[in-house]
Amino acid sequence: MKISKRGLLEIAEHEGIVPGPYLDSRGVWTWGIGHTAAAGAQDPEAMARGMPDDIDTAIIGALKQFDRDLDNYERRVNRAIKVPISQHQFDSLVSFDFNTGGIFKARLTQRINAADPNAADSFMGWLKPPEIRRRRVDEMRLFQTGDYSADGDAIKVWRVDDNGHLRGLDRVMHGDDLLAMMKARR
């Protein structure tokens, strides 16, 4: 399976876009749409600090990395889940793994593969850091009901300083614009 456009927008809206490297809430260097060194090539810690001179080009680069990252997480979810699932369930699991990297060790996965009708409750076993709660609730609801909380009209692009701290909103991007920028790649 591949993530749907709505699933892609769900992740982008939860993550936001940061065109320069920043320290996330756990102190991990991150860039673009939630990309960390743990996700693969392009280590944010090794990137030039602060806002790039050409923000639009940096956003396009971040979207290319996001596309590569999605390919990786799609493969991971496809390998981990052994039972048939719907598109919205797949989208919720890609979001979960994109954020946690935990699809192979999660009780959630074990319960889905065991056809446990209450498997989605296990999304709530992954609440660190505490501010992630809303995302887990959204992922759980998406898995259970197909209700996408993100409608793609508010993908925030954040400014970052030379020390890797977020410094306010640069702009809000509409999902249609994000999809158009990614169209050649998806």
Predicted stretch roles:
Residues 8, 31-32, 58:
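Generic hydrophobic/packing signal
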Residues 30, 52, 56, 152-154:
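Low-complexity, intrinsically disordered short peptide segments enriched in small/polar/basic residues
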Residues 45-81, 87-109, 117:
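Alpha-helical segment that forms one wall of the substrate-binding/catalytic cleft
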Residues 21-23, 84-85:
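Short, conserved, surface-exposed binding loops centered on an aromatic residue
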Residues 43-44, 54, 142-145:
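Short, intrinsically disordered/low-complexity patches at protein termini
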Residues 30-32, 92-97, 121-122:
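Structural recognition of the beta-strand scaffold that forms the well-ordered cores
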Residues 1-9, 14-20, 26, 37-38, ...:
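Long, amphipathic alpha-helical surface segments
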Residues 23-49:
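Substrate-binding/active-site groove segments that recognize
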